[in-house]
């Protein structure tokens, strides 16, 4: 096919890139015209408004774009016309027609057919010897197959191309602006469902990749176009039901073994085992809910037997060898991590007798068949190969059915996962990621995940994220960025906290003492930054148990104030103390010489949590001389104790800090990270932009053409009871509820008054 040049332009100053073109669809030049020299008239290509049309979700799934190699031409002198036309729909092709004989003299049946040589970009070579004069007038026309009666001409004046003086053997390339064809609004429907919930008769107690193909059939049958699933990454830490949370993965690459379709694998040679597993499969499928632990044990046992039976043959195939070569970077550490996790009975690598961190020197022995190390990890290679093969097959099947498979990228990873074990420099392990309080969680959310060391990640161009996105593109054509706000700032909670109230945004512009006093609030560090505990607070929180709490958990600080005893001065210490007391086994517990119920113990524990978080300001995690207003402190006792004038001063400070002070800063932080990531693949990018959303978030999503998430039952405008779909932006995902909210059917039965109001005002039914 000859040489192909793929390139882009950038503006450099002092060795630093100040600006560069859109990288997802770079310029492309095939040297197929047989010339001895090429002269190219390019134009700068910024991120287009309709960039979603270039995504694999649209071009490869919906439109079934078929790229072709341009035909080889042998003209003495050649003019190449190159233009982008992402608006074309399935079955359409592009032609160029004009006043010159070589362009058909405005007759469609003589128009020059063009070749789609890159995504959304078409080209045609023109023989200069058939041109007269130094100008060409032309237009581009979209044609339905070979039916010229269904031609759509671009609007506007004729395009004019002025030819330069050309020598024999020269090829002149004109890169023209996008075709002027109408952009039909693209609206598609879809379904969101976890793979694990897709149980069918062929399942083994849990939904698998075989069931995913059945779901793809249903989506296509109902004329939907998108099937979104929850994360499918491996989350195995303890081999118990606590591993079932899909947003705490141990590897951003590895797939969870529960999703393997056993029915698509060779049968077990052991007849007795085969019959036993078939009976177990039937039993697990009949359960009303997934028995996570039994399913895991059964599938792992089955795969171990199949590996012993068939593993050596499979791992000798070219397909496996290619898989291993393409994924070796992450696969080898992952397999060793899994082996060590199972050997030591814990995913907490800090407690392992050895191998506290991945050692690159181990790679060779772990990758060489016949070594002892290889024998310990080969099973995990084998399982991941099966999973990757089946998921790749499901992805190809979805494309055949014109269905977009949409994945989900969790914002965090497990603190005790392989990613942290392998590359700890990318993570901050002295804090916990979470979310501020909202309508669903008054104490905020503490996910327990480590936060990212963004400075370290940016040092190598966010390659950790780029590799993550590129791996995901093997299986999906669209993805949801879970908690996209984390790329602006993350809610970082101290490691000693259970709830999220003592968190702070990181990064953020914390306040100095002088800045706080600038709002009119006299700075009192001891009063504002330590738990506000008085007798009236204790009476309000604990009622008749106030004296008991004073005697056992507190000590006097002054005549008026108390402080927590050292043994209980953090929420984690309180949690550990009460852990045995609140074990829900129906037994009463001895509690400082008195019996107590589980409920009473939980109430005391939660009250102590509340005391510890009752502060007006939180000290910055990195600079002890700077402070953050504590989130939602207006509902707490320390705020209640302020004079009315001080409350007004504090409220002004609070609103400025959370809603104005950091906006431009957070915008800059997001723009340092997200552009690199959204350009890493051609997947369609969708954001989950819910929660405490600063005003800079829409700026970034719009600038990068990222789809927002609009939940009709939880509108972003607080003045609306329900979201109005006609007001949602075109670049958005519209849904009635998200994966962590009740489904439409469940919501319909929760509150009949609200349901009736929705029925009347949104559906316009009497």
Give the positions of each predicted feature:
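Aromatic-rich carbohydrate-binding modules that target alpha-glucans
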Residues: 1-4, 10-33, 87-135, 143-166, ...
């Amino acid at each position: 096919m000859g040489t192909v040049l793929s390139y882009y332009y950038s503006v450099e100053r002092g060795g630093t890139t100040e600006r560069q073109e859109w990288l997802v669809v770079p310029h492309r030049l095939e040297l197929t015209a047989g010339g001895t020299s090429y002269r190219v008239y390019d134009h700068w290509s910024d991120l287009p408004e309709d960039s979603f049309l270039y995504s694999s979700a649209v071009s490869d799934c919906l439109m079934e774009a078929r790229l072709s190699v341009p035909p080889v031409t042998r003209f003495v002198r050649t003019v190449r016309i190159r233009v982008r036309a992402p608006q074309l729909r399935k079955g359409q092709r592009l032609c160029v027609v004009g006043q010159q004989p070589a362009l058909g003299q405005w007759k469609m049946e003589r128009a020059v057919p063009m070749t789609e040589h890159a995504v959304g970009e078409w080209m045609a070579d023109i023989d200069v010897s058939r041109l007269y004069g130094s100008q060409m007038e032309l237009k581009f026309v979209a044609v339905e197959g070979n039916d010229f009666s269904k031609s759509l001409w671009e609007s506007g004046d004729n395009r004019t191309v002025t030819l330069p003086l050309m020598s024999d053997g020269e090829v002149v390339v004109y890169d023209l602006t996008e075709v002027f064809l109408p952009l039909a609004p693209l609206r598609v429907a879809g379904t969101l469902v976890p793979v694990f919930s897709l149980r069918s008769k062929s399942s083994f107690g849990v939904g698998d990749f075989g069931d995913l193909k059945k779901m793809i059939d249903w989506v296509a049958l109902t004329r939907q176009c998108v099937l979104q699933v929850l994360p499918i990454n491996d989350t195995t830490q303890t081999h118990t039901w606590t591993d079932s949370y899909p947003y705490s993965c141990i590897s951003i690459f590895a797939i969870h073994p529960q999703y393997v379709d056993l029915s698509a694998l060779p049968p077990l040679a052991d007849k007795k085992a085969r019959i036993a597993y078939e009976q177990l499969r039937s039993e697990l499928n009949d359960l009303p809910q997934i028995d996570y632990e039994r399913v895991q044990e059964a599938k792992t046992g089955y795969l171990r037997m199949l590996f012993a039976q068939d593993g050596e043959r499979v791992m000798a195939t070219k397909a496996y060898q290619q898989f291993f070569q393409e994924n070796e970077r992450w696969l080898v550490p992952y397999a060793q991590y899994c082996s060590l996790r199972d050997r030591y009975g814990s995913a907490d690598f800090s407690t392992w007798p050895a191998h506290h961190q991945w050692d690159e020197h181990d790679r060779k022995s772990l990758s060489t068949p016949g070594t002892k190390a290889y024998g310990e990890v080969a099973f995990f290679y084998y399982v991941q190969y099966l999973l990757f093969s089946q998921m790749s097959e499901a992805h190809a099947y979805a494309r055949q059915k014109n269905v977009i498979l949409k994945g989900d990228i969790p914002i965090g990873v497990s603190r005790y996962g392989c990613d942290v074990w392998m590359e700890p420099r990318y993570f901050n392990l002295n804090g916990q990621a979470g979310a501020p309080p909202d309508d669903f969680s008054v104490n905020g959310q503490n996910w327990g995940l480590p936060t990212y060391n963004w400075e370290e990640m940016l040092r190598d161009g966010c390659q950790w994220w780029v590799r993550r996105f590129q791996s995901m593109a093997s299986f999906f054509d669209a993805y949801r960025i879970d908690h996209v706000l984390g790329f602006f700032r993350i809610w970082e909670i101290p490691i000693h906290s259970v709830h999220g109230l003592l968190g702070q945004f990181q990064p953020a512009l914390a306040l100095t003492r002088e800045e706080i006093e600038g709002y009119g609030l006299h700075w009192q560090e001891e009063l504002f930054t330590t738990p506000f505990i008085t007798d009236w607070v204790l009476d309000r929180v604990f009622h008749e148990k106030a004296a008991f709490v004073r005697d056992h958990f507190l000590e006097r600080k002054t005549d008026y104030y108390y402080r927590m005893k050292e043994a209980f001065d953090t929420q984690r210490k309180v949690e550990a103390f009460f852990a045995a007391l609140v074990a829900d086994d129906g037994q009463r517990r001895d509690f400082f010489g008195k019996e107590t119920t589980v409920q009473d113990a939980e109430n005391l524990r939660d009250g102590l949590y509340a005391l510890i978080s009752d502060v007006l300001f939180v000290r910055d995690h990195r600079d002890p001389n700077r402070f953050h207003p504590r989130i939602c402190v207006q509902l707490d006792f320390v705020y209640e104790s302020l004079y009315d004038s001080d409350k007004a001063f504090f409220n002004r400070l609070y609103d400025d800090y959370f809603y104005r002070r950091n906006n431009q800063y957070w915008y800059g932080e997001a723009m340092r990270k997200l552009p690199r990531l959204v350009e890493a693949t051609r997947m369609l990018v969708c954001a989950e932009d819910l929660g405490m959303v600063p005003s800079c978030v829409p700026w970034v999503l719009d600038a990068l053409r990222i789809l927002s998430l609009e939940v009709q039952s939880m509108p972003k405008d607080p003045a609306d009871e329900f979201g109005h779909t006609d007001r949602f932006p075109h670049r958005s995902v519209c849904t009635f509820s998200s994966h962590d909210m009740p489904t439409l059917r469940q919501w319909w039965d929760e509150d009949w008054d609200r349901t009736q109001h929705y029925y009347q005002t949104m559906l316009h039914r009497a």
